[in-house]
Each structure stands twice: as structure tokens, then as C-alpha cells.
Amino acid sequence: MSHYTLGWHDQQNKHYEIGEYADDAFEAVKHAREDVPYLHEHPFSLDSIKKEQ
């Protein structure tokens, strides 16, 4: 399991990040969309996924 940092911008162009633990990036995105209502409503607003070392 690895730590991922996911970033996105809202409609006011404010940048946000969330950290998720997951087996891969796809699972990290799934968890982020479950945890953040905005990402659930706007699933394509994610603009970065970084696997932390």
C-alpha cells in the first residue's frame, strides 16, 4: 500500500489536495471521490496524482 497525494481545482480555481493510501492510483482516485463530495460531483476535476515515496 502506498500514499498518494491528489490535487484538484474547484470552480473558483482554488487548489485543494487530499492524501490517500491505496494499492494503486486508480484506487486512490476512487477513495478520494468517496471522501470528497466535490470530487464525487465533479469526477474529472482532478488534475494531479502523485505517489509519495
Predicted regions span which residues?
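Short, mixed-charge low-complexity intrinsically disordered segments
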Residues: 15, 34-53
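A short, exposed loop/beta-hairpin motif centered on an aromatic-Gly-Thr core
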Residues: 13-27
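Short aromatic-glycine-(Arg/Gly/Cys) micro-motifs in beta-strand/loop hairpins
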Residues: 1-16
